[in-house]
Amino acid sequence: MRAAESLTVDDLDRHWETVAGSAWLFADCNVSAEVLQACAARRSIAHYRLAVDAVSVPKAQRLPPRLDSIDALFINEGEASSYLGAQSSASPEDLAKALLECGAQTVVLTCGGRGVTCGDATALTHIPAVPAQRVSATGAGDALVAGTLWRLIAGDTLAGAVLAGAQLAALTLETDRSVRADLSPALLDSRIASGAR
């Protein structure tokens, strides 16, 4: 986290050739608002797709007021409510719609044990939480983001990608480590193929 917090726009400039050549760029709100803004502003020049994870309620405030340059926004209910200044009683669907109205191209709104609401301006989908023998929640949110992006990059639909991310989060919940030691594409593919729910 310290490395992300110390990242500057100058650092982005130094590595711009690599960044600009990417199909996707992932940033989270551990970086400064200035770095997030630079990533968003340069998206149209470099033609990468930008995915952003809000990380926490306080850090979600680093998101820009308009989300038009964010192709995939990962955010939980508390972060969304705080960012939007919404009532904590707002439904996941209402929060997701409000984030889409702020310009996000797609939203992945996590709701803990109640699953995920995801979609774009045309439709929202609810993905139920995948049952897991919970050992530790550490790393589960990161796993959901990683699994979702992995499948989006492979060409899956958003709902299919989020389902893969939810499966990866469930696998992560079942270990005491933030990254499961036996994690592999084959393990995740097997879990998805078995329809583990």
What are the language-model segments listed below?
Residues 1-5, 54-57, 78-80, 130-133:
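Short, acidic/turn-prone active-site loops that include or flank metal/cofactor-
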Residues 1-24, 29:
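Conserved phosphate-binding/catalytic loop of the ribokinase/pfkB sugar-kinase fold
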Residues 5-15, 34, 53-61:
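Active-site glycine-rich loop that binds ribose-phosphate moieties when present
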Residues 13-20, 37, 41, 64, ...:
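Amphipathic, non-transmembrane alpha-helical secondary structure
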Residues 28, 53, 79, 136, ...:
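Acidic active-site catalytic centers that drive phospho-/nucleotidyl reactions
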Residues 31-37:
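Active-site-adjacent beta->alpha loops and helix N-cap segments on the catalytic face
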Residues 37-40, 44-49, 54-124:
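Conserved phosphate/ATP/ADP-binding segment of small-molecule kinases
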Residues 90-197:
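Conserved phosphate-binding/catalytic region of the ribokinase-like
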